[in-house]
Amino acid sequence: MLFFSCRNGELIPPPDSVKQYLHISHTRTNNNNLIDSVAESISYQNFDMLWLGGDLTYTTSEDDGTMSYIDSIFTVSSENTLWSLGNHDYSELSRIQEFTNRLPYYSCFRDGITFLVLDTQDSLSNIVGEQKLLFDNVLDTIQESTHLILLHHKLIWMYGDFSLEQEIDSVSNGHLGSCFHCINPNRFWQDLYPKLVVVQKKGINVICVGGDIGVFTKEYEYLTQDNVQFLASGIKEGTNNNKALIFKHDVTNGYLFWEFELLENLTMN
């Protein structure tokens, strides 16, 4: 199975009939429970799926009013909206579950793609307990998929790799440390990555998509030597050149294309 990606703004033209998915993250403002005004004006109904990278508002789950506001924009109650929770979303997990009918971590299958949504706030960036059991079960049993996509807020794969760790302060909103919003020391490379490589070697393309960027950079790509793809997109409210990540999926042939797109361009569609 061939796999294409976009780099340097060059998008390989996909077939006419494709599905479109949007990854957007860190839409919060600094002093209220609204989202960035440009992000608010995007026509999200134009996309077949929404992948939310977390930190939607300043305290997203604090009250029903804010959750209803978020639901009116992103339709978080829809099975086609996948949400990896960030630290600013984490006030009341029970309220989020009431709106989404999901745990903070879950898996699903859509049109040949297996999705695994991780909760990187739980256990300070470590995937353990029931969440690790879910991870193991999905990766041990995955078969009829062209892609495995992991959605997560924190860039947990930046810790434990020398070259990636050097980039943390210029890429991730949260620095390396012990705080709740930090990239915490974790065992991604020991406990998760080897199984991702096994899946990749089966011919199933593995993509990890993080959401905790936007303050220092709006886009990030890194391909490991095992061809596991790391991506991240996020915005900072009120700044220029905010970007989201658009995926175009040729379901028939199993191709997945992506590009980073300026938010302003999405409001014109």
Show which residues each predicted segment covers.
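A solvent-exposed, charged loop/short amphipathic helix patch at secondary-structure junctions
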Residues: 49, 162-187
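Short acidic, glycine-rich surface-loop motifs adjacent to enzyme active sites
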Residues: 142-166
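Acidic, His/Gly-rich catalytic cores of divalent-metal-dependent hydrolytic chemistry
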Residues: 252-269
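N-terminal active-site segment of His-dependent metallophosphoesterases
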Residues: 6-67, 163
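Bacterial Sec-dependent N-terminal signal peptides
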Residues: 1-13, 196, 200
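Extended active-site neighborhood of metal-dependent phosphoesterases/phosphodiesterases
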Residues: 64-147, 171-179, 191-207, 213-256
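Active-site glycine-centered loops adjacent to acidic/histidine catalytic or metal-binding residues
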Residues: 26, 54-55, 86-87, 153, ...
